[in-house]
Curated annotation (Swiss-Prot):
It catalyses: cytidine(32) in tRNA + S-sulfanyl-L-cysteinyl-[cysteine desulfurase] + AH2 + ATP = 2-thiocytidine(32) in tRNA + L-cysteinyl-[cysteine desulfurase] + A + AMP + diphosphate + H(+). GO terms for molecular function: 4 iron, 4 sulfur cluster binding; ATP binding; magnesium ion binding; sulfurtransferase activity; tRNA binding. One of its GO terms (biological process) is tRNA thio-modification. One of its GO terms (cellular component) is cytoplasm. Catalyzes the ATP-dependent 2-thiolation of cytidine in position 32 of tRNA, to form 2-thiocytidine (s(2)C32). The sulfur atoms are provided by the cysteine/cysteine desulfurase (IscS) system. This is tRNA-cytidine(32) 2-sulfurtransferase. HAMAP family: TtcA. Belongs to the TtcA family. Keywords: 4Fe-4S, ATP-binding, Cytoplasm, Iron, Iron-sulfur, Magnesium, Metal-binding, Nucleotide-binding, RNA-binding, Transferase, tRNA processing, tRNA-binding. Residues 1-18 have a biased composition (Low complexity). The gene is ttcA. A motif (PP-loop motif) lies at residues 66-71. The thiolation reaction likely consists of two steps: a first activation step by ATP to form an adenylated intermediate of the target base of tRNA, and a second nucleophilic substitution step of the sulfur (S) atom supplied by the hydrosulfide attached to the Fe-S cluster. It comes from Burkholderia orbicola (strain AU 1054).
Length: 326
């Protein structure tokens, strides 16, 4: 069954569920679009996993769960993929309870028991440390992130996890690229897979190809018990918020622009940049032979089209899972 046939079947089923009144055309259309959303997200996550070999046979994946929409969606999709994957891997969900005032400690354990996922709650009062060290009114995100990262690395070792999965998505990656360009003066993004600072862990980002707007819709449809992210009382990261607003505006006014920016991260041409550590500019000499990559930038229209313009997440599905039944 191809995607079109599967979508049609889902729509037909939604039109007349047993024992219930037939759905209106609007409800049928919503069901159809929701089914497409589910399939798109699962496909994009599967594609990212395949492209970067994020999960391998026998892995134990530690899914870091914060209680936000992104980490809930990541866990939900990984569980779906595991059911149909041609490899065996384990999943353990981990939440770091940082003892923020008002944090609903019961929410995540109840949810994880409901879905039947092994989990571990790590209790560490990093909230008090951050509040003591960071002046009032300043953002605590940077220090909090460093403390949280160190704890999660330790927990991964204690649990025997071979991969640490974080819930960063496409928008996070593009935001980081822009932040580094505008405020750091360097071309640096957020990799889909990396070795941790201590050299002992592999960190993966299965949502790397997924748009934040899709995750927002997904979380609403799945009715995840979202925990607010502002319990710490920290001021928001204004620079990142600025980049987020910029990306949202571009997505609305210039469809495809953000996708092309994201796609560019996987199509780097060092010979047409200025980093001498990536390309031997100083030793470059005329060889007398034509170089197809020489000054091609001056000859071709820079706007991509067709296959070249496709975002990484739009590539063909990987073999980790069949999507017909999703």
């Amino acid at each position: 069954m191809n995607d079109t046939a599967a979508d049609a079947a889902t729509l037909d089923d939604a039109a007349a569920p047993a024992g219930r009144p037939a759905l209106t055309r609007r409800e049928q259309k919503e069901a159809y679009e929701n089914n497409k959303l589910f399939k798109r997200i699962v496909r994009q996550v599967g594609q990212a996993i395949g492209d970067y070999n994020m999960i391998e046979q026998g892995d134990k994946v530690m899914v870091c769960l914060s209680g936000g929409k992104d980490s809930y969606a990541m866990l939900d999709v990984l569980l779906r993929l595991r059911e149909r994957a041609p490899i065996d891997f384990d999943i353990v969900a981990v939440n770091l309870d940082q003892k923020q005032p008002g944090f609903p400690e019961h929410v995540l354990p109840e949810y994880l028991k409901q879905v039947g996922v092994p989990f571990h709650i790590e209790n560490q009062d990093t909230y008090s440390i951050v509040k003591r060290l960071v002046p009032e009114g300043k953002t605590t995100c940077s220090l909090c992130s460093r403390l949280r990262r160190g704890i999660l690395y330790r927990v991964a070792g204690e649990l025997g996890a071979t991969k640490i999965a974080l819930g960063h998505h496409r928008d996070d990656i593009v935001q980081t690229l822009l932040l580094n360009m505008f405020y750091g003066g360097k071309l640096k993004g957020m990799p889909p897979k990396l070795q941790s600072d201590d050299g002992k862990n592999i960190v993966i980002r299965p949502l790397a190809y997924v748009k934040e707007t899709d995750l927002e819709k997904y979380a609403e449809l799945r009715e995840f018990p979202i925990i607010p992210c502002n319990l710490c009382g920290s001021q928001p990261n204004l620079k990142r918020a600025e980049m987020k607003a910029l990306i949202r505006e571009w997505d609305k006014r210039f469809p495809g622009r953000v996708d092309n920016m994201f796609n560019a991260l996987a199509k780097v041409v060092p010979s047409h940049l200025m980093d001498t550590t990536l390309y031997p500019f100083q030793s470059l000499r005329a060889t007398g032979e034509a170089d197809p990559q020489g000054d091609i930038a001056f000859d071709e229209e820079p706007c991509a089209s067709g296959d070249d313009a496709a975002a990484p997440g739009a590539a063909q599905p990987i073999s980790i899972v069949q999507f017909d039944d999703l």
